[in-house]
């Protein structure tokens, strides 16, 4: 990984390219982020930078976090995330990371927390086949067979079952950057990204773009 930034999802819209074709895009408020800490191989065993995003009041933070920000001499930030980079020599504590690190045509991976759907059955959660819907059937949208009887005498790990759906960390890979607006700190990527409006997103350069 060579570059990354934190952002906030604003929603989806559509724009037109030079040929007049419609492109569905997600609008992301990306940055500005501030470098709060640098980690090196000598002190931490790996190279990384810790960045903060989104202003927050001091009363919303714990005392350890308040001390962490004051030691770095940077404003209080709501979100703290770490990026492992190959080379961190170009970053200093207190420096800003802005959306202009990306340009149209770049490929990025976008990570977020998907929308929570609550408790769901296997049909909605995994797309399982239904049972017979006719009269006399005792299962329509139930799990069906979960295991054998005496042997093995248990249900194997990984068997699809009803449970909590959504609210998981999801990464969409290799999305194309369509437009960058440095003045408004906006990043437009082609397609959809995880999470509801206003949720935190982690944008990194794609490793599969080559």
Swiss-Prot record:
GO term, biological process aspect, one: translation
Record carries keyword Iron: no
Keyword terms: Ribonucleoprotein, Ribosomal protein, RNA-binding, rRNA-binding
Keyword check for rRNA-binding: yes
One MF term in the entry's GO annotations: structural constituent of ribosome
CC terms in the record's Gene Ontology section: cytosolic large ribosomal subunit
Region (Disordered): 131-155
InterPro entries in UniProt: Ribosomal_uL3, Ribosomal_uL3_bac/org-type, Ribosomal_uL3_CS, Transl_B-barrel_sf
Pfam families in the cross-refs: Ribosomal_L3
Subunit structure: Part of the 50S ribosomal subunit. Forms a cluster with proteins L14 and L19.
Family: Belongs to the universal ribosomal protein uL3 family.
Known function: One of the primary rRNA binding proteins, it binds directly near the 3'-end of the 23S rRNA, where it nucleates assembly of the 50S subunit.
Record-linked PANTHER family: 50S RIBOSOMAL PROTEIN L3, LARGE RIBOSOMAL SUBUNIT PROTEIN UL3C
Protein name from the UniProt record: Large ribosomal subunit protein uL3
């Amino acid at each position: 990984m060579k570059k990354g930034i934190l952002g906030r999802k604003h929603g989806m819209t559509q724009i037109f390219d030079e040929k007049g074709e419609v492109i569905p895009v997600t609008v992301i408020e990306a940055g500005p982020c501030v470098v709060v800490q640098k980690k090196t191989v000598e002190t931490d065993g790996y190279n990384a930078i810790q960045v903060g995003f989104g202003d927050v009041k001091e009363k919303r933070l714990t005392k350890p976090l308040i001390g962490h920000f004051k030691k770095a001499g940077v404003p209080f930030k709501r979100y703290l995330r770490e990026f492992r980079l190959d080379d961190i020599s170009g970053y200093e504590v207190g420096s800003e990371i802005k959306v202009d690190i990306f340009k149209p045509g770049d490929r990025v991976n976008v990570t977020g927390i998907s929308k929570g759907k609550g408790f769901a059955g296997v049909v909605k959660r995994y797309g399982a086949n239904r049972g017979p819907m006719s009269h006399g059937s005792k299962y329509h949208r139930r799990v069906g067979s979960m295991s054998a009887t005496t042997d093995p005498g248990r249900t194997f790990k990984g068997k699809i079952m009803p449970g909590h759906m959504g609210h998981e960390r999801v990464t969409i890979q290799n999305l194309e950057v369509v437009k960058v607006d440095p003045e408004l700190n906006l990043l437009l990527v082609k397609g959809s990204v995880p999470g509801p409006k206003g949720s935190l997103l982690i944008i990194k350069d794609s490793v599969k773009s080559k």
